[in-house]
């Protein structure tokens, strides 16, 4: 049976269509995925992301442990609350998962990892903690609500109380802050400004209701996926996995090769890949022909060979079909995509497609 978040009853009250996602019963939409998408781009929407896995990493060895575990380097983090996006890698250089790390002190970090990979991630993290003075604590006592959109911050601030409201109001992008049992990060997965708010599970339903009264529209997994695709943000299990390097997933920027003396899981494999060259490119596609781009469709790249779409769909903001794809190194700006057996013209672009409500590519 699927697990339920603390907001499960709220979703049922709102008439959500519920689906299984990574073992959790989650809302796909509340009536109109397109309307929910536009609400986030134009005003404010909220997502129940309580299924995400929150892990507190504490101890005198926390910093050294994370510098070994993650491809990005937590030593960059100097200001309390600052967040870092990174991948955990296999020794062969594949992606175990992507995650966000919040730096609270040299002995205290908070990690937010994906829901569908919870058990695998926790086991991986614990196995690699051997020899480090570190304690890993899963925070399954917390719920999490993401409020996103151009008016999302203001509407969230209007219903936050006391100290956490002051903390949240002062946050810069990609920084988090804590007050009591509440934690707010100015982060998200939509390409819009907003907050991701962690709070005691028992307090989540009332907070959800207050946000709704303030004019924040509930949004489901369907809108979350089209928003993150427009924002050019990777989805684990589609755009990268244990068989694919971050260097071929548009994530080279998340790998810290400096300082050279830092060893991290997967480093040697990535250095070999870099030295060998010929890495596939991770690109955006805009369909210029008919149909809708979908994952696993073949990308016909002429003399360069073939690539594959990793994520695709219709962009409600742009009114065209877009995709993320992995293509051979020598691919030109024009390609064709095999859409149901018919080659359709498409154009290579550099993601993102949309950020902060504005188109980033020519249509």
UniProtKB/Swiss-Prot annotation:
GO terms classed as biological process: glycine decarboxylation via glycine cleavage system
EC identifiers of the protein: 2.1.2.10
GO molecular function, one term: transaminase activity
InterPro entries xrefs: GCS_T, GCS_T_bac, GCST_C, GCV_T_N, GcvT/YgfZ/DmdA, GcvT/YgfZ_C, TrmE/GcvT_dom1
Cross-referenced Gene3D superfamilies: Aminomethyltransferase beta-barrel domains, Aminomethyltransferase fragment, Probable tRNA modification gtpase trme, domain 1
Domain of life, per lineage: Bacteria
Keyword Membrane attached: no
Catalyzed reactions per annotation: N(6)-[(R)-S(8)-aminomethyldihydrolipoyl]-L-lysyl-[protein] + (6S)-5,6,7,8-tetrahydrofolate = N(6)-[(R)-dihydrolipoyl]-L-lysyl-[protein] + (6R)-5,10-methylene-5,6,7,8-tetrahydrofolate + NH4(+)
Gene Ontology terms: cellular component: cytosol; glycine cleavage complex
Record key words, sorted: Aminotransferase, Transferase
Function: The glycine cleavage system catalyzes the degradation of glycine.
Family per record: Belongs to the GcvT family.
Subunit and partners: The glycine cleavage system is composed of four proteins: P, T, L and H.
Protein name per its UniProtKB record: Aminomethyltransferase
Organism listed in the record: Thioalkalivibrio sulfidiphilus (strain HL-EbGR7)
